């Protein structure tokens, strides 16, 4: 085995290409995560809230522990996450992944997880100050609608999974279309018997 020359160029990624990849990843992630803002307000506006009764200043109990409002709030979060994932997956694929490849796809999926976290934070804090104020100043026996809380934290993965699904299906569709065109060309070029 011959010794390698120290001055010989190394194969692999250069610093400028790493910076470019980091920029693509960061831009894809940030652009996708920002989509969690309207989703959070949408979840806060659409999801039903649990009815609670003030027990004393600052404390409350759930009026109906068997209420379906918990499940409905989680369902709304998951539906908004799937819709957000499908939308950002399609737009992200068309605007970034086709041109920038796997780095943009990874950024988009990381950003989708960020968007789900932003949606959760905004939705849970939507109306929280008003609820706390009412809870602190209402007499015992008053019924209030509580702020949202996601019970099924697994709902956070719906957005990134939907985005990853769209990217994978889009890439497979593009590649299979390319393969079918190549196959048709090879059949057209082959001599007929």
Model-predicted regions and their roles:
Residues 1-18:
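Short, Lys/Arg-rich, polar N-terminal cytosolic tail immediately upstream
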Residues 13-24, 48, 87-105, 124-131, ...:
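Cytoplasmic membrane-interface segments at the C-terminal ends of transmembrane helices
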Residues 19, 23-31, 72, 76-80, ...:
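Alpha-helical transmembrane segments of integral membrane proteins
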Residues 28-44, 106-124:
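Hydrophobic alpha-helical membrane-insertion segments
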Residues 38-57:
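Interfacial/capping segments of alpha-helical transmembrane domains
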Residues 51-70, 138-140:
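Perimembrane loop-to-helix junctions flanking transmembrane segments
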Residues 51-54, 116-139:
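Juxtamembrane non-transmembrane "cap" segments at the membrane-aqueous interface
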Residues 69-84, 142-165:
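Hydrophobic alpha-helical transmembrane segments
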């Amino acid at each position: 085995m011959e010794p390698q020359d120290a001055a010989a160029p190394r194969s692999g990624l250069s610093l400028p290409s790493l910076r470019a990849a980091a920029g693509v990843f960061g831009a894809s992630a940030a652009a996708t995560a920002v989509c969690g803002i309207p989703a959070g307000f949408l979840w806060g506006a659409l999801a039903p809230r649990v009815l609670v009764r003030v027990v004393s200043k600052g404390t409350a109990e759930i009026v109906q522990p068997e209420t379906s409002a918990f499940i409905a709030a989680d369902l709304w979060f998951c539906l908004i996450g799937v819709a957000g994932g499908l939308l950002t997956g399609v737009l992200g694929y068309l605007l970034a992944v086709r041109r920038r490849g796997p780095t943009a796809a990874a950024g988009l999926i990381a950003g989708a997880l960020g968007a789900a976290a932003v949606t959760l934070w905004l939705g849970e804090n939507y109306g929280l100050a008003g609820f706390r104020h009412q809870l602190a100043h209402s007499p015992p026996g008053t019924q209030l609608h509580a702020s949202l809380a996601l019970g099924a934290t697994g709902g956070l993965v719906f957005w990134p999974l939907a985005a990853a699904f769209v990217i994978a299906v889009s890439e497979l569709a593009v590649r299979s279309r390319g393969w079918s065109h190549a196959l048709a060309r090879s059949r057209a070029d082959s001599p007929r018997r």
